């Protein structure tokens, strides 16, 4: 029974039930597909990055699990079904994979979505989705071979404030699934919802979480993949990227870090006050932010010496990539530019070179001694 409870052949998001099966009748393949596409791993499906970053809970899981190891098992199993990591996606094979979306309509159940393809095609496109969504972790870790699982449930939970999945837009869920299955660009509504959530959370400690940054990066790369004139966003910090929006995001992250060092424990930092303005109307605010940062740098140089000059060099590295070496940005950023800003901001924060900061401090201490 495909709709049976706890079956690997269905998953419900809101009022929509997704049903999937294949001619191979391979339960293990269906389980791995369900976890990679819809649910995530059993122990992390209800816990996303922004919750992890801001949670104060000390509660440990009842059973010790290894998410990296179990993710690797899922990825390798799907690659085995495909043949290998870079195997040719066979769209003519007789082994078929089917996906159906059902939702209530008055007193009836209606078909909202129907898609089919070869097992190779469906599985291959899910793996492509995971590769596109791969990004450096907030702690600066990156595994290019085994990307994290980015299931639909966690994506939707990361970009909508509603915790009840029945309040998520059904059409967006279906369009996201269709884009994954067919290997198409993600729906624009996904980008807009993600940007709105980031702006909504600008006063939180982590407005741009790993998953949100991964989504915006993947959205833009898929959208522009066939345009060789547009540079693809990388998984980690790209110091050669001269896109003004990317540089604005990097610069904002640096200014935030400088303030953290100058005024530890500040109640309302520049992210709380200016993130939304800086990402949407950078031309209005960056001059003021740099003036503010000059005071912070002066304080750091007096108290920590070498660390202040280290931050100076970091800022100059970014400014040198801008026209005229000046932080002169457009008055307004488009949604795509705001997305690039968010990715640049996240990349810079994830890159934070704590070792270099520590060495800058040590150099100053040695000079004093």
Label each region the model flagged:
Residues 1-369:
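Extended alpha-helical scaffolding segments
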């Amino acid at each position: 029974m495909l709709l049976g409870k706890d079956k690997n052949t269905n998953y419900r998001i809101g009022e929509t039930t997704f049903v999937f099966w294949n001619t191979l009748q391979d339960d293990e393949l269906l389980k791995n597909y369900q976890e990679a596409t819809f649910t995530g791993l059993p122990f992390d499906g209800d816990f996303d990055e922004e919750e992890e970053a801001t949670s104060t809970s000390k509660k440990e899981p009842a059973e010790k699990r290894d998410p990296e190891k179990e993710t690797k098992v899922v990825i390798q199993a799907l690659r085995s079904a495909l043949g290998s990591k870079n195997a040719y996606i066979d769209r003519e094979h007789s082994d078929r994979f089917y996906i159906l979306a059902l939702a209530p309509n008055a007193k009836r159940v209606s078909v909202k979505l129907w898609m089919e393809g070869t097992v190779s095609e469906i599985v291959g496109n899910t793996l492509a989705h995971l590769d596109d969504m791969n990004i450096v972790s907030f702690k600066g870790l990156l595994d290019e071979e085994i990307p994290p699982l980015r299931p639909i449930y966690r994506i939707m939970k990361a970009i909508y404030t509603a915790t009840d999945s029945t309040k998520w837009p059904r059409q967006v869920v279906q369009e996201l699934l269709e884009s994954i299955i067919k290997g198409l660009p993600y729906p624009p509504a996904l980008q807009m919802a993600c940007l709105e959530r980031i702006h909504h959370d600008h006063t939180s400690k982590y407005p741009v979480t790993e998953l949100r940054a991964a989504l915006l990066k993947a959205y833009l790369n898929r959208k522009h993949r066939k345009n060789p004139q547009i540079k693809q966003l990388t998984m980690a910090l790209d110091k050669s990227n001269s896109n003004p929006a990317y540089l604005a995001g990097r610069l904002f992250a640096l200014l935030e870090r400088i303030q953290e060092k100058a005024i530890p424990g500040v109640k309302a930092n520049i992210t709380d006050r200016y993130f939304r303005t800086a990402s949407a109307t950078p031309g209005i605010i960056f001059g003021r932010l740099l003036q503010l940062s000059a005071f912070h740098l002066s304080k750091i140089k007096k108290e920590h010496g070498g660390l202040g000059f280290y931050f100076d060099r970091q800022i100059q590295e970014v400014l040198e990539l801008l026209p005229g070496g000046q932080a002169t940005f457009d008055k307004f950023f488009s949604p795509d530019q705001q997305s690039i800003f968010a990715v640049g901001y996240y990349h810079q924060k994830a890159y934070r070179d704590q070792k270099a900061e520590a060495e800058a401090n040590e150099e100053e201490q040695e000079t004093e001694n």
